[in-house]
């Protein structure tokens, strides 16, 4: 980066999915809305799922989602690629295949055209990798840059994966390490090592396509991508939507080492506090240290898939996932709901 270039992250108050409106506030904002009832709407926003799904025919359903955010990287190309990876992930989480996308962009009038071009190029290249066609979009002027995609995909109506189908006995798998939100806070302060910055960028630009392709071969009952609401926020949505509770083996969680160091120092994104406020009443932390809890509330950007799979298929799916996503781990299990707390940290 040239010395006279403005760091993109300095133009944003929040980074990536850390800019999301809190889940509790969002629920209040959407409450009482008049929504048209349609029997072909297979998935709406009533259970806070990753995307909407609309049945078109007996063997075809549309999957639609939208995601955009302010810069999470100073390199404009990397920012564009991360934003596209994150937006496409919602379709993969539903078991679908993304096919079409539209750009959503806001840029300062003073931003060099070369910078804007690089943001778009990052998005286009990642969409190309995913087999997705970007057919247009919409752009506005704004003091804070933002970029993302509205994505349309397809899935068989009988093979839709939601966040509300987890069953007691299911094994919970997860595909990516945790700590991206903490790292991006540290990156804004220039206190993250170069190798860890590269690791973060690599994780955030890794499509969930391979994980999706693996999981649809097995008896997966529920899936969600873990992004802005953090691991515990998204798992809470799964537990509540499925009417179950989740026991999380914290020793199995793959925390990024430098994120652990920063969390212990108190380098935390604002989104972590919003996520904690939303999910904490439903979480039994046991005797786990505060830094570990903070990381489990940490907002992830382009995070991995949390997969609730039939126990008979768990080992085979985990082995296949590790063949394409080496960081895949067995995080815990789903239990019958006994009332009270929804998530227990073991």
PLM feature spans:
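Helix-biased detector of long, well-ordered alpha-helical tracts
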Residues: 1-346
